[in-house]
Amino acid sequence: MSPQAFSDSVLNWFKQNGRKNLPWQIKVSPYKVWVSEIMLQQTQVITVIPYFKRFIKRFPDVQTLANSSLDEVLHYWTGLGYYARARNLYKTAKIITKKYQGNFPLSLNEIMSFPGIGRSTAGAILSLSYDKCFPILDGNVKRVLTRYHGIKGWPGKKKIENKLWSLAELYTPRKLTKQYTQAIMDLGATVCTRRKPDCDICPLTLTCFAREMGKQHDFPEKKLKSVIPKRDTVFAIMENNNGEILLEQRPSSGIWGGLWCFPEFLSHLRIEEMIKRKYGFNIKQQKEYKPIKHTFTHFHLTIRPIHIKIRIYKDKDYDTKVLKWIHPKTNPSLGLPAPVLSMLIDLNNTKRAVLNE
């Protein structure tokens, strides 16, 4: 199939079957495309939609985002995971507002220079917003191309990725680039899916290598799995006499960077001594909760929560910028890791149940 025939087939399929009413497709703007593309990294469309709507309602344009606090941005990202995406979004918003007066540049290289934006995201911004002829290569497109051509090897390898970029460039038409970009993404997301590709309705089925060989599930090849290490940590859920819970902001780098979390300890051993030394608190009562399992891309984490009631707390030179007392029934405008948010909700529900007895 010629490149022209390939793109025409995908475009004709899109006219009848493509997704045209996603939130970021309504009143399209570079800002909306950018936010949606960042959210869609590592996250499915169905999960992203409510987060995107809520985020855009609060931050309707790049200037509003740039003028907000990082804490609030992380708060609206809570639950999506991969929080470096939100931090980079915030950094880039400030750059665009300050250096470009709130307007996205039309240069691919300039957009790629922004934090968290690679070639595919930059291409999506330019093609979907301005109909510029730049290819994209997200996970959906990689899957379509590797299956269609029977490309062996993990797509994350530079050699394989370069080959895929060459094909993406070859098939991206100079006209109707915007429609083709959305079409090839939709084809991968809704037809050429990872687990159950629906080859019978695919516009490329007659000339697809994987379909012809019956090897759809062999492509794209997966990265060789390494053993994922396991880690343990203790979360101290410290409650004062007012029923407030102590949260501590994590360092900007590392896991859950910049988010607010329960104070963390390596072990429950001598935890009373460590809490008194660090925070000046005397412990009235403590109770261990059932461990919580949480998985990151590169390790499994077992969280062991301990609910600790504080008898008194001394006046101490605290850094109030990184320590906050919050009530579990409130919804603070802070970025919270999903397990922390879940534990706060559970704690509030437990308190309500006790009061209603």
Where do the PLM segments sit?
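Intrinsically disordered, low-complexity, charged terminal extensions of DNA damage-control enzymes
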Residues: M1-K20, Q25-I26, A189-E357
